[in-house]
């Protein structure tokens, strides 16, 4: 079926490609001195004794942060999710993925322990879950350091996630990793580049015009899974000149309702492309929107203002700044 005026951006690579290879990464200072480094991670001090040498990561965006910092040689392996091949194919760090052992599509205690890591980088609902017993405390129990993705830090006294602006979470993790691995100059270079990229995209938003209402559609069974205020898409949309219709939800990735989504009448819809299975494909999600009795009448669906971006562009990671550029260009092309 021909889908007019639907832009499916399978790769967010143009502006991040320059950071994907050829970076001169300084020798970690801790490798020579053995000095301990303490950073703040999810509101608590985290001390790392020396530079980690056997790192396990979970999820594409997390792994790409290590690659962007030039730390591929520190990884003993990574885990991902079924269908990640599309994410990896579109990655500016594809060559690093090909050189790094894939430990599997499941982040489990058995997989992690078998890799004998000294540092595990994951996040709540990005691998860490009480239901599986794979938690930061368990990582400590096997003698490794757990580092938590800042986008997924839990708010005090609750399991809701998000304690700062999503892009600030990215910059925080890059700076922390820079300190831990002795590559802070590289981290600062990336942070400055990303801030500049985002600022230039934000400056292009039309003056005197209400931001476009944007719905982030991740997936759905009974109700849609979407981005609240603290997930990366909310700030990506805002910096691009739009407004996340669920920015009032004090969480990161969370469940909303079709009724609420339709009532807020999105003018554009941002679709997460997992590249996984026919039931979770971009095409299937588009058909779901077009045939849904409430969503079919929204401005975004009627006018085919639908943009798909790779999963790794929309979770915290080094593709976020280019995602801002891509969403901004899309909104401008639709008159917003």
Language-model features and meaning:
Residues 61-64, 81-84, 119, 125-129, ...:
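Solvent-exposed loop/turn segments at secondary-structure junctions
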Residues 54, 59-115, 119-120, 124-128, ...:
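A short, structured surface patch at a secondary-structure boundary
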Residues 164-173, 248-249, 270-336:
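Structured C-terminal subdomain patch of bacterial secreted/periplasmic proteins
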Residues 41-43, 100-110, 130, 250-257:
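Short helix-initiation/N-cap motifs at beta->coil->alpha
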Residues 226-253:
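Alpha-helical, coiled-coil/dimerization segments enriched in small aliphatic residues
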Residues 108-119, 134-137, 142, 256-265:
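Short helices/loops that flank or line small-molecule/ion binding pockets
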Residues 84-85, 126-134, 144-176, 209-232:
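Extracytoplasmic ligand-binding site segments that recognize negatively charged/polar headgroups
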Residues 2-65, 176-217, 333-336:
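Bacterial Sec-exported substrate-binding components of ABC uptake systems
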């Amino acid at each position: 079926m021909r889908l007019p005026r639907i832009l499916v951006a399978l790769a967010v690579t143009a502006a991040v490609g320059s950071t994907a290879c050829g970076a001169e990464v300084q020798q970690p200072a801790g490798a020579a001195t053995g000095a301990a480094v303490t950073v703040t991670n999810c509101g608590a001090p985290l001390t790392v004794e020396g530079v980690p040498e056997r790192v396990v990561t979970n999820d594409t965006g997390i792994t790409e942060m290590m690659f962007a910092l030039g730390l591929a040689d520190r990884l003993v392996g990574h885990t991902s999710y079924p269908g990640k091949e599309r994410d990896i194919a579109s990655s500016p760090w594809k060559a690093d993925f090909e050189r790094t052992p894939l430990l599997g599509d499941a982040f489990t205690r058995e997989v992690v322990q078998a890799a004998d890591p000294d540092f595990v980088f994951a996040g709540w609902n990005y691998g860490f879950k009480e239901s599986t017993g794979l938690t930061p405390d368990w990582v400590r129990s096997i003698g490794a350091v757990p580092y938590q993705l800042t986008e997924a830090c839990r708010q005090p006294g609750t399991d809701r996630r998000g304690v700062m602006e999503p892009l600030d979470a990215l910059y925080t993790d890059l700076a922390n990793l820079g300190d831990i691995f002795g590559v802070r100059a590289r981290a600062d270079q990336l942070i400055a580049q990303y801030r500049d990229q985002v600022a230039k995209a934000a400056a292009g938003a039309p003056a005197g015009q209400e931001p476009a209402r944007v719905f982030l559609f991740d997936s759905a069974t009974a109700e849609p899974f979407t981005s609240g205020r603290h997930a990366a898409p909310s700030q990506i949309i805002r910096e691009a000149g739009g407004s996340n219709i669920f920015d009032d939800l004090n969480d990161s990735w969370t469940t909303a309702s079709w009724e609420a989504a339709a009532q807020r009448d999105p003018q554009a819809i941002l679709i997460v492309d997992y590249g996984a299975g026919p039931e979770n494909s971009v095409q299937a999600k588009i058909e779901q929107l077009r045939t849904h009795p409430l969503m079919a009448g929204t401005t975004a669906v009627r006018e085919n203002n639908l943009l798909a971006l790779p999963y790794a562009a929309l979770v915290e990671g080094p593709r976020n700044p280019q995602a801002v550029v891509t969403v901004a260009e899309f909104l401008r092309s639709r008159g917003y």
